[in-house]
């Protein structure tokens, strides 16, 4: 009989998120993860702010995931955040290339498959 292997508590997106949090904090950002509970449905994964660069909402995505990366609530909330001056940036890893995205126009819509 094979021993029971417990399921991981968190998936690959959580590991990416933890790496991004460390990466941003090392660069002087304050990072506050959202909890993803029913009261925060549709909000991005991280609220970040920096003394020099201001605030960013960051949504963490697994680059290997297939299918629609956004929930219905995110598809409702993200455009409203952006329309009201709070962009949403998608990051798929803790790299310099991903970090550079935070200094360009918000990019969440690029992950929807819809051209703007």
Specify the residue positions occupied by each region the protein language model found.
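Catalytic phosphate/metal-binding cores of nucleic-acid and nucleotide-processing enzymes, i.e., regions
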Residues: 1-116
């Amino acid at each position: 009989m094979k021993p029971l292997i417990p399921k991981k508590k968190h998936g690959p997106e959580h590991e990416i998120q933890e790496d991004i949090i460390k990466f941003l904090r090392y660069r002087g950002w304050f990072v506050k993860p959202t909890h993803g509970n029913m009261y925060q449905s549709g909000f991005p994964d991280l609220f970040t702010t920096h003394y020099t660069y201001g605030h960013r909402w960051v949504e963490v995505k697994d680059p290997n995931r297939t299918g629609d990366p956004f929930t219905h609530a995110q598809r409702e909330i993200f455009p409203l955040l952006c329309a009201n001056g709070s962009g949403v940036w998608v990051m798929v890893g803790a790299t310099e290339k991903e970090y550079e995205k935070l200094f360009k126009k918000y990019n969440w819509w690029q992950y929807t498959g819809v051209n703007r």
